[in-house]
Amino acid sequence: MFIQLLQALEQSHLLKIMAHYAFLDQNNIVIDVITGKNEGDLGIDWEQHYGEFRGLICKRTSYNTFGNVHANGGAPYRKNYAGIGFTYDPDRDAFIPPKPYPSWNLNTNTCLWEAPIQCPNDGQKYYWDETSLSWKLINT
């Protein structure tokens, strides 16, 4: 009955879908991301509702958050928008992307991985070479 009411409200455009939610496996790895209701719509805790419905841990994520910065100037939410394969860190309340290379380090403020040395900023294109632990120029 409740789900039918929600569907009727959606079809009548009285209720808008705007929030995003990540579902986690038992190791806090993101296995799915959906679009859903805004927290508080109809007085419901949607994180809890979606989690119980699927039998998984569910965490809201912000499409506009990357590197602990909100694109529209709002408050950043959980450091980064969740993607499949990201890890949810409950101590930091953050989504962390997969580590791209063994030598890279986690920036605990942005929860993004950084190379041990900065990429040159000279207008050229580079790629990371893990064997030499250095940036290599892309020959075009």
Give the residues covered by each predicted segment.
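Interaction-interface detector
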Residues: M1-T140
